[in-house]
Structures are given as C-alpha cells and as structure tokens.
Amino acid sequence: MWNKNRLTQMLSIEYPIIQAGMAGSTTPKLVASVSNSGGLGTIGAGYFNTQQLEDEIDYVRQLTSNSFGVNVFVPSQQSYTSSQIENMNAWLKPYRRALHLEEPVVKITEEQQFKCHIDTIIKKQVPVCCFTFGIPSESIIKRLKEANIKLIGTATSVDEAIANEKAGMDAIVAQGSEAGGHRGSFLKPKNQLPMVGTISLVPQIVDVVSIPVIAAGGIMDGRGVLASIVLGAEGVQMGTAFLTSQDSNASELLRDAIINSKETDTVVTKAFSGKLARGINNRFIEEMSQYEGDIPDYPIQNELTSSIRKAAANIGDKELTHMWSGQSPRLATTHPANTIVSNIINQINQIMQYK
C-alpha cells in the first residue's frame, strides 16, 4: 500500500500527506480538516505569541482527536547594522507615506518567542513539532524527545539533511526550490543559499539519510504525491495546495492572485522579510531589487515592511504586499481541505489501478 510506511506509523496518520505550517495562513479548521481526513494538519506558529499558540492548540483539539503538528521558526543568528535600518527606512518612506503609516519601532523577540513556543508545545503535549530556518539546540531537542514529541526538520540541500539527522530529527522535509513562501535554508555553501528542485533534491537526500524523507515544493495533487514516493520520499508536505483552500486564513486577494497566476509568475526575493521566499512578482519586489544587497536580514526587514504589507492587503493592493506561492498555481483549487485530501487519494488510487 502506498500510504503505509514508517512515516505514517511514526506520526499516527492514515495518509502521508502533511499540510505545511504556513505562518499567518493556517486556521484551526484547516489543521483539523486535514487531520480528520487522515493527513497531518500543522499549525503555523511562526508569528504567534504564547497565548495565541495555546488558544490555537486548544481550538484544534476541539475539532479533532487525531494527530497534528506545530511549525516553529528556529531563531536566526544574523547580524545587521544601524545604517542598514536607517537606509531601509529611507527607502520605505514613500510607501509608508502613500499608506499613511508611521515608521515602526523594531522589536526583536525571536529567542524569547521560540523558547515560549517550545514550552507551550511540551506543556500541551503536541504530537509533532516541525522546524524551519535551522536546527534547535541539543537541549531543546532533548526536552522535546523526553516529552515523546516527534520532530521534523527542514532541508534544502543534502548537507542540511545530514545535519538534521545528526541532530536527532525523526524525519526531514526536503524542500525543493519550487516551494512557495520562505526557503528553509540554514547552511550557505560559498555564501549562496541552495536552490535545488524537488525531483533532484529528494532522491539525493533519500540516499544519504536513514530517517523518512518528506518531499515538498510544487506538489499539488495525486500525481505529485505518487511521483515523490517513487523518488524515495515516504510522504509529502503541501503548502500552496492548502493555501487557496476555503479553510485557510489566506485573504481573497492572495487566493485570487494564486488561482489566476501562471507557473512563470513567481520569483524568489528577500524584499519583504529579509529571508529568501517565493511569491508572485509585483511592484514592491521589482522596486526593491535595486537594494537587494543592502536589505537587512530577517527578522529586521520583516518588521520594517510588516505595516506596509498589512495596510496594502487591507485595501486590496497586491502590488505592495507579499503573495507567497509555489510554482504550480495552475493546479490550485478553492476546495475545502478535506476535499483536497480525498481528491489526492482518489487520483493516486486511480493512477495505480491503471499501471
């Protein structure tokens, strides 16, 4: 059976389909719907404070008794200068003026937020914890394992996958360059982040690690799931496929933009957050490209542009806000999450029946 393997057993799920923990875009209904359909729903906790995460976990538990996960951001060890911030504020001034916004006071609470997330995940006995942007400390991994929480890391290269396995991850997401949203990269060979496609990355990681590999990037339907399994993955993680679902927290602006875009419309940019992320190209990205080498690292840039993005989204201006999307938008639907999962399963079974 295509849906019975080490990953499904480890995560206590029926189908090896994981809904990506997209920060700011998941809802309890989305998470629970995927879990109730036999997959693994994941809370995107990246921007939550402690109370928000606790409330989200409690709400999900009201909607499902099945396994689910929480995705957290590992704090970045980045450096920045005051002149970088001053310059960026000057460059962003016209956008703020147009939207009647004040210059924000930057508050960096990454470390404290991450610590609180881990404490909450342990306290609430969340079954699965997923990491993006790196690998947590040995002590944090030990605490989570002692609480019998399964750990999933993210890798965009073979070296990152090896590092995840050595650190004690139970499974690894192999994030191909087709994936929408932030790149999970944390190692920089020759100071350049990896941009390896899913079909190339997955088998190369599978060949060098002993733990289950989860394919991610451009996977939208049963064909992509089955292809990933053929490549050696034991499961898939899907983001954009669920982002356009009726059950996600995506705005109608973003949902419509993805549904109406083409495979050639996305770019990878640091303009919005200071970390590379794939989204639909727009005026803000193009105008900020001239400052590409001077953009402060995450989370500074994320803080500096946050109010601009929110204000633009509120007035329906897709040219000044982030529009995260993978490279397979033509395959996106607005179906409820449970329908998306059942369609994937039916398509796989149909393909296997005729092979």
UniProtKB/Swiss-Prot annotation:
Pfam families: NMO. The keyword Nucleotide-binding applies. Belongs to the nitronate monooxygenase family. NMO class I subfamily. Gene3D superfamilies: Aldolase class I. GO terms for biological process: response to toxic substance. Its cofactor is FMN. FMN binds at residues 71, 175, 180, 218, 237-240. This is Probable nitronate monooxygenase. Binds 1 FMN per subunit. One of its GO terms (molecular function) is nucleotide binding. It comes from the Bacteria. P3N is a potent irreversible inhibitor of the key enzyme succinate dehydrogenase in the Krebs cycle and electron transport chain. P3N has been shown to be a toxic metabolite to bacteria, plants, fungi, mammals or any organism that uses succinate dehydrogenase. The keyword Oxidoreductase applies. Nitronate monooxygenase that uses molecular oxygen to catalyze the oxidative denitrification of alkyl nitronates. Acts on propionate 3-nitronate (P3N), the presumed physiological substrate. Probably functions in the detoxification of P3N, a metabolic poison produced by plants and fungi as a defense mechanism. It comes from Staphylococcus aureus (strain MSSA476). Its EC number is 1.13.12.-. Keywords: Detoxification, Flavoprotein, FMN, Monooxygenase, Nucleotide-binding, Oxidoreductase. It catalyses: 3 propionate 3-nitronate + 3 O2 + H2O = 3 3-oxopropanoate + 2 nitrate + nitrite + H2O2 + 3 H(+).
